[in-house]
Swiss-Prot record:
<dbReference type="Pfam" id="PF00276">
    <property type="entry name" value="Ribosomal_L23"/>
</dbReference>
<dbReference type="GO" id="GO:0003735">
    <property type="term" value="F:structural constituent of ribosome"/>
</dbReference>
<dbReference type="InterPro" id="IPR012677">
    <property type="entry name" value="Nucleotide-bd_a/b_plait_sf"/>
</dbReference>
<comment type="similarity">
    <text>Belongs to the universal ribosomal protein uL23 family.</text>
</comment>
<keyword id="KW-0694">RNA-binding</keyword>
<keyword id="KW-0687">Ribonucleoprotein</keyword>
<dbReference type="GO" id="GO:0006412">
    <property type="term" value="P:translation"/>
</dbReference>
<comment type="subunit">
    <text>Part of the 50S ribosomal subunit. Contacts protein L29, and trigger factor when it is bound to the ribosome.</text>
</comment>
<dbReference type="GO" id="GO:0019843">
    <property type="term" value="F:rRNA binding"/>
</dbReference>
<comment type="function">
    <text>One of the early assembly proteins it binds 23S rRNA. One of the proteins that surrounds the polypeptide exit tunnel on the outside of the ribosome. Forms the main docking site for trigger factor binding to the ribosome.</text>
</comment>
<dbReference type="InterPro" id="IPR013025">
    <property type="entry name" value="Ribosomal_uL23-like"/>
</dbReference>
<dbReference type="GO" id="GO:1990904">
    <property type="term" value="C:ribonucleoprotein complex"/>
</dbReference>
<keyword id="KW-0699">rRNA-binding</keyword>
<protein>
    <recommendedName>
        <fullName>Large ribosomal subunit protein uL23</fullName>
    </recommendedName>
</protein>
<keyword id="KW-0689">Ribosomal protein</keyword>
<dbReference type="InterPro" id="IPR012678">
    <property type="entry name" value="Ribosomal_uL23/eL15/eS24_sf"/>
</dbReference>
<dbReference type="GO" id="GO:0005840">
    <property type="term" value="C:ribosome"/>
</dbReference>
């Protein structure tokens, strides 16, 4: 039970950009913002549990936070982790129908 709760906290949100839409069309890969402590096996298990699809490969990367400036103060956004999840052929994640 504790492991399932941990898996639910791993996937933060989907990451949508021009690059991810091109990768989705060409390689059937989805992009997610994930927890920084998540490993590739954790991400794979979380996607299998939530969406019931078979994952082919996963590529992860740490995205550096941007520097933000407001008046004379310089702040910084925190780093975050992004995962590209490539599904097997014929597999598809339907985000609309998975939410109940």
């Amino acid at each position: 039970m504790i492991y399932q709760e941990r898996l639910l906290k791993i996937l933060r949100s989907t990451h949508i950009s021009e690059k991810t839409s091109i990768i989705l069309e060409r390689h059937n890969a989805f992009s997610f913002k994930v927890a920084k402590y998540a490993t590739k096996t954790d991400i794979k298990n979380a996607i299998n549990m939530l969406f019931s699809v078979k994952v082919n490969t996963i590529n992860t990367m740490i995205v550096a936070g941007k520097s933000k400036r407001k008046a004379n103060k310089i702040g910084r956004c925190s780093n975050w982790k992004k995962a590209y999840v490539v599904l097997d052929k014929g597999q598809k994640i339907d985000f609309i129908n998975t939410v109940e």
